[in-house]
Amino acid sequence: MLDDRAKLLLKTLVERYIAEGQPVGSRTLSRAPGLDLSPATIRNVMSDLEGLGLITSPHTSAGRIPTARGYRLFVDTMLTAQREHMNAPSHLPPDQPQKVIANAANLLSNLSQFVGVVMTPRRASVFKQIEFLRLSDRRLLVIIVSPDGDVQNRVIFPEADYTQSQLVEASNYINAHYAGLTIEQVRDRLQSEVEKLRGEIAALMQAAVKVSSEVLTEAQEDDVVISGERNLLSVTDFSSDMGQLRRAFELFEQKAQLMRLLDVSSKAEGVRIFIGGESQVVPIEELSIVSANYEVDGQVVGTLGVIGPTRMPYERMIQIVDITSRLVSNALSHRK
């Protein structure tokens, strides 16, 4: 456990390093407001902090910088609740989910000046509504509406031909008896009830389940929307180290690791922070991510966040992510 003096010194060092980006020495700390310690005492405390793995000396510099462990202690125990003024909108206009997500990613990157990432709403294995539209003989359009309002269309080729009135009757029955159930629940019920259903309804139900499963499980290239990657070019931590910059851009290009990281983040409530390689999913020591879930009608459907250098103003990033998650939740929950 750190005593109050060591905590105050670590907090001051981290804040100074975040603000200036330069290793912090004992002489600089001795002039910091509220830190009434001599340079000799500060050096002793800094030596203790270094021994605990909370700060380190880069190269031959006389100053110190926080380690990932030091940032973690700072974030967990030393952040202030001071609210910053920021030019965030009061709302995001309700729109199609894809448009809301794109707007949110842009908002995150613009406010943070780092990288905004938003996981597109998960396709819950629940359909809110299914409709059938006759296109021609034995050629139907299946329209699937998810709980978050996303609409997917698929063309199917049934063995039998159906009139539009039969299709309307079938969709009305399906929506009345099966809407809100998961695909697995519908499949189980269908197996036990298929003999009781009229032939055309049973056949269309089976087709609907098959199409819904395909829609909800197929991989999508736009599972993560990313905005502001070029902002990292202006961050001295990256612009001076091409190796770090390359690793960061490889992460954004592949997306698979980002998806796993956001999925891990979605397991927690509130704002979550991964510093450096803490997540063990994205082992990039120079990056941190601040993330939060967003909801539709009270149900978590996705995760969003800001990715930037470990030397980021965490208080501000937490506010940006929290505000954006609320805006997205509100926009998606109030679509007409």
UniProtKB/Swiss-Prot annotation:
It comes from the Bacteria. The keyword Heme does not apply. Disulfide bonds: none annotated. The keyword Cell membrane does not apply. GO terms for molecular function: DNA binding. Keywords: Repressor, Stress response, Transcription, Transcription regulation. GO terms for biological process: negative regulation of DNA-templated transcription. Belongs to the HrcA family. Negative regulator of class I heat shock genes (grpE-dnaK-dnaJ and groELS operons). Prevents heat-shock induction of these operons. HAMAP family: HrcA. This is Heat-inducible transcription repressor HrcA. It comes from Variovorax paradoxus (strain S110). The gene is hrcA.
